[in-house]
Amino acid sequence: MAVDAKLIKELREITQAGMMDCKKALEASDNNIDNAIVWLRENGLAKAAKKTDRVAAEGIALAKENDQKIVILEVNSETDFVAKNEKFLSLVDEIANALLSSNASSLEEGLQVKTNSGLTIEQSLISATATIGEKIALRRFELVNKTSGSSVIYNHANKRVSTLLVFDNKLDSTDAYNVAMHVAAMAPKYINMDQIPDDFKNAEMHIIKEQAKDDAKLQAKPANVLENILKGKLSKRLAEVSLLDQLFVIDESFKVGDFLKSKHVSLVKMIRYEVGEGIEKVVTNFADEVAAQLK
């Protein structure tokens, strides 16, 4: 029986099992997802599969480099306690090294990269999930080839924020590091104003206009004056998310853009990972959690 590739993908997302295991499970279950999950559990993947419905919103972010490439990645766990575990930290480092030795360009490709242990990253994650007792997942990564310009990485001490920057020309390592640290601290969404999409601008202007409705002094101003004030507020808001328009945390007497211009370099790539961003955490009342375990 032919197996639908979409079903394989769906089963992998549910169980974190390997691609070929999912294919075999679907073949043995007549393409029935529920029966395929049972098949996987019956064939030794039950422990990992049972944990995949949990939310893994903790973990660490890491940026690492070798002579040719740089990788930035986020690996998630369910609790901060596990994220500080030496076995977990070693696993993340092993995954980073494997990715640096690969040409993977997508999460799907990355999961199939082999680590030094001989297992694929996907298999290593399944094994760690079963051993540690929490869902462990590679959420995302990006692999960047080094160029003739400068590149820099920054890993914050809490292991929750990492940045990767690439410049078009050579930049002093200390200066580059300071910019990378600024990106970690100030969390710009875009390199410059030109990168900000219209959807973001329109959404921000809508919020500004709604807020202005409750300001009697603003509403009393002539329409043209009010319009200019609102535009000014929007420009200020956009500057907050545009790296080059932010005041440099190292010296707030000038903007990041002015600093880079004085060094005759341009930033061509900016990546910032923060653990758990965009993941909705499930908050459980401790008493309820204990009661649930006693049932």
UniProtKB/Swiss-Prot annotation:
Region listing for Involved in Mg(2+) ion dislocation from EF-Tu, in residue ranges: 79-82
Keyword terms, alphabetized: Cytoplasm, Elongation factor, Protein biosynthesis
Gene Ontology terms, MF aspect: translation elongation factor activity
The keyword Protein biosynthesis is annotated on this UniProt entry: yes
GO cellular component terms given for this protein: cytoplasm
Entry keyword annotation includes Protein biosynthesis: yes
Entry superkingdom: Bacteria
Signal peptide interval: none
Location of the protein in the cell: Cytoplasm
Name of a matching Pfam family: EF_TS
InterPro entries given in the database record: EF-Ts_dimer_sf (IPR036402), Transl_elong_EFTs/EF1B (IPR001816), Transl_elong_EFTs/EF1B_dimer (IPR014039), Transl_elong_Ts_CS (IPR018101), UBA-like_sf (IPR009060)
Record NCBIfam families: tsf
Family of the protein in this entry: Belongs to the EF-Ts family.
Function: Associates with the EF-Tu.GDP complex and induces the exchange of GDP to GTP. It remains bound to the aminoacyl-tRNA.EF-Tu.GTP complex up to the GTP hydrolysis stage on the ribosome.
Name of the protein in its database record: Elongation factor Ts
Organism: Mycoplasma capricolum subsp. capricolum (strain California kid / ATCC 27343 / NCTC 10154)
